[in-house]
Every structure is written in structure tokens, then in C-alpha cells.
């Protein structure tokens, strides 16, 4: 590990002096590091590398931070599923709108399909106007263009774009005359009763990869020849000069811009080679095995990567109505939402593992296990009609027994493990104070209730009476008054009451999976 470049190591120091612990952003400028920076000493232990620097600074790196690989931004062909039409014979990727909205796993699967395969179809989106904006806003932000925040795809009397006619539209990407292009496009079908008007998709990355394999010289021409893409109407004039196939610095396909209708006049040398390559690429995109054709029905919303997929439409007769509404969005927000969903899912998996693993241990001498106790507390909160954040706090109030410096068994041996603080601190990585503060204060709430509520102490179980003494005993009058003024005191008292109810052997409760959607909705 110490063979890593010193400047790289120091630039990635994770300490609070170098990075803001709240957001991970650097607190120094690269030019502020000593020009002769060197490692003075280093040791490896417990999965960490500790470095003493020549300027006296100390850094401590987790091994996984040093061993990790750079996955990039997910925009290139690397890691994508390049496809042909036959790959979707079993069906198109997607989900019902209801499942997408209510199940984070379904939402993550849809967004992953857009990222990895380039598209997904949501079915059952209400067939009312402007719903396409709601779909875009479910994972990101609408990209407003000269067409507005949304546009209607239907026959117009004086169209400024062939998309607003009934003629066939060959495979293309949208808005190549913008820089940057809208990286996502959404099309929501409101009505489609006309004969014809089927939708088509072509994986532009796959087509480019085929060109690279069959005609590498043509591929190279299309990656290095800037093409003028132009759009003009009476209120707009747009132009962007970009190659048809754009590569990243490592030579991987990153973006395809292909729109015959918007290609301007190319000038300069090498025109014969360009047009031969252009024609070859166009012919590849029209190969039947690369063209995925399907029909959008009312309520279907197609979401696709406009930097990768070419979309098309067959001609349709005006013997019925065909009306789609579309809008643009961007991949960065979709990728961000997907990453957050996966991060939350990983956190929930960790919590679920606690319930299934350590949660099976006895609960401090009570007749229930740790998991049974917390599930009973959550069930009591739910039965009382408590808001979701308090159900979550009741469910998670004792996780600190697993994540403190001292285990729950230490508490029963006379050592205060401060599990309310360690649990709240651990949960703060995922939940806001509406969840964490009742967890943090639930032990104090027991001490408070014993001080101010006659008869409360007599209701405590033997184990709870013992831990009360270890945790400081009932509050005095001044402590109780101060506690009552705390912002989270009322919620903590509620959690405490459910805590005391949750010690009944064999009491039926929902499992952890029942609360998973509730927790997911509360996560930050």
C-alpha cells in the first residue's frame, strides 16, 4: 500500500482536518501541500494503513479505500448490457407505476435497467396530461428546452419537427444540436388508436461496437470527425459540432449522436471517408436483429438513454388518434437516485441482519429476544396510530446494544453501555433527528417517568429496574424539568412507554420486512 504515490495518499486523507465529516468535501487546496511531501513512517493493522507524513500530519486509511477500483461515472460501454432485439423476447424491462412508486426495490430495478440496458417501460401511468413530468421528477429534474418543459407528440398543422407528423421516423437520437444533449428522454402514451405508429429502439452502443469490429477504420473516422448538428425555427437557432460516436479518454464508447434530419453541412477534407463510414453505420442501425419494435399503449411511459439508444417510429394512418407527451431529463439525477436507493437498501440489509442475527439473543434477562422486543415496541407504536418516524424509533430504539463500545451484556453487569447514544449516532448516518432523537433520549425518558409519574417505577420489569440504577436512577427535580424542555422529549416518552410494553413472551408481531418500506421512506 505504501507504494501508492504520496500526493495521491495525502489528497485522499479521510481525517476531519482534511475533509468535512458532514459532506466529505476537502478542506485544503492541492498547492498547500509541501512540495517535498513524503511518507515518514507507516504501519498496517486491523485493516487500516496508518501514515505519518514528513510535515507531521497523520492519516489513517481503511484498506477498502485503498484497494478500490475506479468504476467511472457509468456512462461508457463498460459495464453496460449491449443488446439485440432477441434479448428482449421474454419481455421489456420495467414495472407497474404503482409498484415503482411504492416499492424501493422496484424503483431501483427500473432505474438500473435504464442505466444498464438503456431503457425501461413503466405501465399504468395515469393517462392524464403532464404525468410524464411526475415520472421524471420521481428520479430527478425536468430538462426544459425550446420545446418547453414537455412536448406533445401528435400531428400538428404546421410542425417545426417531423416528429409532429404521421410519417415514419428513422432511428435517431434527440437534440444532437445541443451541448450537452438531454441525456434522458421520456415518452408517455396517452392514446394510440391509429393504425401503425409502433415504437422502435436500437442500442447505439451495440451498433457502434459492431462497426468497430467489422470496419475499424470507419469507426475511427466517426469518432474523430466533428459533425455540425443544427436546428432552426423562427425563434431558435442551435448548433453543436460533435462526432457521431464519442469516446472517453480511455477509448470507450461514451455517447452516440445520430440524427439525419439535423445533420448540417460538413466541410473540409476526408469527406469521402466520412460519408462511407456514415453510411455503413446507418446501415448497421437498420439491421433487423438490432431493431426492437413494440407498441406503446395508453398508460405506458418509455424512459430511455438519449446518449445511447436510437429511437424510431413507424408511419401511422390518421384513422385514429396517437398522442404522446414527452419531456427530457438527465442521467446524473437518475444515477444519483439509483445510488441512494442502493445505499439505503444496503443499510436496511445491515439492520435486517441485526434482527436476524444478534437480535436472536436474549434481551437482558427478559422473556423475549432483542428482536422480539424491538418488533413488539414497533407493533405497539403502530397499533397506537403513531406517525411513521415514531414507529421507526420504537423499532430501532435498542440497536445501540449491538453498536456501542460495550455490549448489552455489559449493562447487566453494572456498566452503562450508553446504548441510546451509540444507537442514535449509528442511525444518524441514515435517519434524521425525528428518528434518532427519540432513540437517544429513550433511556433518559425512563429516568424522567420514574421521577414524575407516580406508579411508573413499580411497573418496571426486574431487568429494567436493575438497568435504571446502572443508568443513573430517577431524575431529580431539576433534571426532570430540563428534560421536559428538550425538543424530542415528548416523542422519547412515547417510545419509552412502548418499550416497557414490549416484553411479552410469544406475542405475535409482524416481521422486520413489514417495516422495511416505512424505514426506506424515512431514510435520508
Predicted regions mapped to residue ranges:
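Aromatic/His-enriched, Gly/Pro-containing loop or helix-boundary segments
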Residues: 27, 33-36, 155-160, 165, ...
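Residue-level detector of functionally special positions within alpha-helical transmembrane segments
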Residues: 20-30, 118, 172, 306, ...
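Active-site environment of non-heme Fe oxygenases that use a 2-His-1-carboxylate facial triad
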Residues: 71, 76-119, 124-303, 307-343
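Short secondary-structure capping/junction motifs at helix and strand boundaries
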Residues: 58-59, 119-123, 144-148, 432-440, ...
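Metal-dependent phosphohydrolase cores
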Residues: 339-524
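Motif-centric detector for short Cys/His coordination patterns
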Residues: 2-103
Amino acid at each position: 500500500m505504501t507504494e501508492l504515490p504520496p500526493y495521491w495518499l495525502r489528497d485522499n486523507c479521510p481525517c476531519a482536518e482534511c475533509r468535512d465529516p458532514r459532506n466529505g468535501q476537502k478542506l485544503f487546496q492541492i498547492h498547500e501541500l509541501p512540495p517535498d511531501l513524503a511518507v515518514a513512517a507507516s504501519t498496517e493493522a486491523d485493516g487500516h494503513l496508518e501514515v505519518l507524513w514528513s510535515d507531521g500530519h497523520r492519516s489513517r486509511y481503511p484498506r477498502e479505500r485503498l484497494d478500490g477500483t475506479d468504476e467511472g461515472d457509468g456512462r461508457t460501454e463498460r459495464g453496460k448490457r449491449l443488446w439485440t432485439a432477441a434479448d428482449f423476447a421474454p419481455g421489456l424491462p420495467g414495472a407497474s407505476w404503482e409498484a415503482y412508486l411504492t416499492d424501493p426495490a422496484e424503483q431501483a430495478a427500473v432505474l438500473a435497467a435504464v442505466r444498464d440496458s438503456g431503457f425501461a417501460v413503466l405501465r399504468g401511468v395515469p393517462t392524464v396530461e403532464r404525468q410524464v413530468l411526475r415520472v421524471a421528477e420521481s428520479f430527478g429534474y425536468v430538462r426544459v428546452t425550446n420545446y418547453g418543459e414537455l412536448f406533445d407528440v401528435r400531428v400538428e398543422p404546421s410542425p417545426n419537427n417531423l416528429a409532429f407528423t404521421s410519417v415514419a421516423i428513422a432511428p435517431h437520437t434527440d437534440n444532437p444540436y445541443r451541448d450537452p444533449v438531454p441525456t434522458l428522454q421520456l415518452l408517455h402514451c396517452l392514446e394510440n388508436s391509429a393504425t401503425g405508429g409502433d415504437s422502435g429502439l436500437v442500442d447505439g452502443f451495440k451498433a457502434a461496437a459492431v462497426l468497430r469490429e467489422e470496419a475499424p477504420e470507419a469507426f475511427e473516422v466517426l469518432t474523430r470527425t466533428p459533425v455540425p448538428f443544427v436546428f432552426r425555427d423562427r425563434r431558435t437557432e442551435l448548433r453543436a459540432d460533435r462526432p457521431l460516436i464519442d469516446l472517453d479518454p480511455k477509448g470507450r464508447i461514451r455517447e452516440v449522436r445520430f440524427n439525419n434530419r439535423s445533420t448540417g453541412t460538413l466541410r473540409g477534407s476526408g469527406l469521402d471517408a466520412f460519408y462511407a463510414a456514415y453510411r455503413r453505420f446507418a446501415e448497421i442501425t437498420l439491421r433487423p436483429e438490432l431493431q426492437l419494435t413494440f407498441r406503446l399503449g395508453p398508460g405506458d411511459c418509455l424512459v430511455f438513454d438519449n446518449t445511447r439508444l436510437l429511437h424510431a417510429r413507424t408511419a401511422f394512418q390518421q384513422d385514429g388518434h396517437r398522442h404522446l407527451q414527452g419531456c427530457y431529463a438527465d442521467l446524473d439525477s437518475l444515477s444519483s437516485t439509483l445510488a441512494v436507493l442502493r445505499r439505503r437498501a444496503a443499510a436496511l440489509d445491515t439492520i435486517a441482519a441485526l434482527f436476524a442475527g444478534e437480535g436472536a439473543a436474549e434481551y437482558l434477562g427478559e422473556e423475549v429476544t432483542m428482536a422480539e422486543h424491538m418488533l413488539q415496541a414497533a407493533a405497539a407504536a403502530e397499533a397506537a396510530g403513531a406517525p411513521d418516524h415514531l414507529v421507526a424509533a420504537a423499532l430501532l430504539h435498542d440497536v445501540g446494544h449491538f453498536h456501542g463500545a460495550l455490549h448489552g451484556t455489559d449493562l447487566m453487569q453494572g456498566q452503562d453501555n450508553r446504548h441510546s447514544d451509540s444507537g442514535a449516532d449509528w442511525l444518524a448516518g441514515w435517519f434524521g433527528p425525528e428518528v434518532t432523537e427519540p432513540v437517544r433520549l429513550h433511556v433518559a425518558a425512563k429516568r424522567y417517568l420514574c421521577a414524575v409519574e407516580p406508579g411508573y417505577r413499580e411497573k418496571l420489569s426486574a431487568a429494567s429496574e436493575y438497568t435504571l440504577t446502572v443508568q443513573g436512577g430517577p431524575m431529580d427535580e431539576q433534571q426532570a424539568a430540563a428534560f421536559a424542555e428538550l425538543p424530542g422529549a415528548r416523542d422519547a416518552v412515547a417510545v419509552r412507554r412502548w418499550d416497557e410494553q414490549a416484553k411479552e413472551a410469544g406475542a405475535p408481531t409482524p416481521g422486520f420486512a413489514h417495516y422495511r418500506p416505512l424505514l426506506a421512506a424515512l431514510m435520508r
